[in-house]
């Protein structure tokens, strides 16, 4: 058996900040090549790499305390190393922010998932990470066919949700809502798919906007510590990710996700800002048309559509940052291989 790249495992070595991590590589007996570029960044290259090969980024840990995705990725990497997991796609596995993970917090100085646009940002530990990740994405996707590029950025939600798992499709200038991507969501038994209506500054948006990748931010359950995640609830997702890496069609039946459009983004404009509900309210809690659910300065925050629902409410964001998304359920269809709605 080939010597492992890791002292313990991809995840354990990434989080062990007492040990240095050196760039190194190995080739397995099946011809699959593993290249550890830096702490938390592993490239896996199939034996038969070609122009037809998918190029897939599977990222986790953009928020340090969202650990379920790290555990899922770690198990896949382990099974690749042992030869149990077939590899036909070129993959980049990322555990992004081990310092925050070890501190059991989302971030140290700045929300990393707000730093992937081209705006000027204040210096921070997270800005250094964002800049490194941008370079890694560029290097990974350079000289690859556009249609081969995928990016699944895996997260967990802070609060409970009426949908235990959901995915967000970023809004870009490119055709990044393919039927293949939606089929992946449905086979993963992800309960809801949100279609963003404006550009953002997230990691998945960056890959979709600048590299035309089929990209999603995927929210998997709630934040928990390593070893305390309900990974059995993500069996369908795990199988579907593994099938994607092996480039085979899933054998299990899909479950169509409920599709939502983002109707608007609530941005905090004033110091005097609050919601009328407590922090226990679930994502996708809906309101009647005209129902007031908060205020921003002297302006009431109210539902502008019947059954308009709130996602990611956060009363504590800084002025100028997103305080919530408002979403409405839609009937979607495919047009020229792209998911659209009327």
UniProtKB/Swiss-Prot annotation:
Residues annotated as signal peptide: none
Enzyme Commission code(s) on record: 3.5.1.96
> Does this UniProt record's set of keywords contain Zinc?
yes
- Residue positions binding Zn(2+): 63, 66, 155
Question: Which Pfam families does the UniProt record give?
Answer: AstE_AspA_cat, AstE_AspA_hybrid
Catalytic reaction list: N-succinyl-L-glutamate + H2O = L-glutamate + succinate
Domain of life where this protein originates: Bacteria
Q: Which UniProt keywords apply?
A: Arginine metabolism, Hydrolase, Metal-binding, Zinc
Recorded GO molecular functions are: hydrolase activity, acting on ester bonds; succinylglutamate desuccinylase activity; zinc ion binding
Q: How is the cofactor bound?
A: Binds 1 zinc ion per subunit.
Q: Which cofactor is recorded for it?
A: Zn(2+)
GO process terms (BP): arginine catabolic process to glutamate; arginine catabolic process to succinate
Enumerate the InterPro entries for this protein. AspA/AstE_fam, AstE_AspA_cat, Aste_AspA_hybrid_dom, SuccinylGlu_desuccinylase
Q: In which pathway does it act?
A: Amino-acid degradation; L-arginine degradation via AST pathway; L-glutamate and succinate from L-arginine: step 5/5
Q: Which residues form the active site?
A: 219
Q: Which family does it belong to?
A: Belongs to the AspA/AstE family. Succinylglutamate desuccinylase subfamily.
Biological role stated in the UniProt entry: Transforms N(2)-succinylglutamate into succinate and glutamate.
| Protein name listed in UniProt | Succinylglutamate desuccinylase
The gene name reads: astE
